[in-house]
């Protein structure tokens, strides 16, 4: 599928998964980067380091988990070892801010706005993954109707579509990929005029026990208690959900984030089961890019 074409239409109720199928991408990025821009960007090393990682396997009583206690704003966690299932993400770079513009959590930024290009705040695919070109949308913006295909049924799609319209959705940027083990990932960034607006809508879309509207392939979910809050960067609101057993055609994990004027949805799905560690890693990385 070529860039700019819409995402595959939603499957009938109860069928399919919230993560769209991936089409092979062999091309380079559509957005050129000048040498001057590269010099302005802070390079966040995502391979070869976690900052202050705390292993909590025994404490949580699970096979693999992790937490982060301290982290500089310019640090993004990445691959430390291969033994715990973390993915090898490439070098991650925050785009430069316009001259004089604050970050989304700076004290002088009353609106909580992201002044960098939202499309450049999307997490890149990890090494060896195949990108879903359909999620690029048009000029990097995904049409609202295509984003709404992540929801399970027409009722959910209609309700969320009306909420996004009422709250003045500005843009949707998205990226998706499939890793070699068959795990399919999708990241959606939804931007609004202010952090206050995004915060109010975030509360309407999420709940403690489950999101307000089910994603495709995950009709029954529960709050993911195993996702450590110590991994969340300061100022990031997060609610993670796991599909209840027995799983459908795929095991679906999802996390809703709110940072400043932006709501993010991270979804991973895999036949059989979707591992917790790469999901948590992806959520933390995307949170850091938006912080």
Question: Could you describe each region identified by the protein language model?
Answer:
Residues 73, 78-80, 163-170, 261:
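Glycine-centered secondary-structure boundary/capping sites
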Residues 25, 30-115:
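Hydrophobic single-pass membrane-targeting/anchoring helices
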Residues 110-244:
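A small/polar (G/S/T-enriched), proline-flanked helix-loop surface module common
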Residues 41, 178-180, 255-259:
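Short glycine/proline-enriched loop/turn "hinge" motifs that connect secondary-structure elements
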Residues 206-291:
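Extracellularly exposed regions in secreted/surface proteins, prominently low-complexity, repeat-rich
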Residues 70, 193, 272:
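Short loop/turn segments at secondary-structure transitions that flank enzyme active sites
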């Amino acid at each position: 599928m070529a860039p700019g074409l819409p995402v595959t239409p939603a499957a009938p109720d109860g069928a399919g998964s919230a993560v769209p199928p991936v089409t092979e991408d062999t091309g380079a990025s559509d957005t050129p980067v000048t040498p001057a821009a590269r010099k302005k960007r802070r390079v966040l090393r995502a391979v070869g380091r976690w900052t202050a990682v705390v292993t909590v396997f025994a404490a949580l009583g699970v096979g693999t988990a992790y937490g982060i206690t301290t982290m500089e704003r310019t640090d993004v966690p990445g691959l430390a070892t291969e033994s715990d299932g973390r993915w090898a993400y490439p070098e991650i770079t925050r785009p430069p801010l316009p001259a004089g513009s604050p970050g989304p959590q700076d004290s002088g930024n009353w609106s909580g706005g992201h002044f960098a290009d939202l499309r450049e705040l999307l997490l890149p695919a990890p090494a060896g993954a195949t990108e879903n070109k359909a999620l690029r949308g048009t000029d990097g913006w995904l049409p609202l109707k295509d984003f709404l295909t992540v929801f399970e049924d027409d009722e959910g799609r209609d309700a969320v579509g009306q909420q996004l319209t009422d709250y003045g959705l500005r843009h949707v940027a998205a990226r998706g990929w499939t890793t070699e083990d068959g795990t399919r990932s999708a990241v959606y960034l939804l931007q609004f005029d202010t952090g206050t607006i995004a915060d109010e809508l975030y509360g309407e879309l999420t709940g403690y026990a489950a999101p307000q509207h089910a994603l495709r392939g995950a009709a029954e979910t529960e709050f993911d208690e195993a996702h450590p809050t110590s991994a969340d960067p300061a100022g990031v609101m997060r609610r993670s959900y796991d599909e209840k057993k027995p799983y459908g055609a795929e095991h679906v994990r999802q996390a809703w984030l709110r940072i400043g004027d932006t709501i993010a949805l991270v979804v991973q799905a895999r036949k059989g089961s979707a591992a917790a560690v790469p999901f948590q890693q992806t959520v933390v990385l995307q949170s850091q890019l938006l912080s």
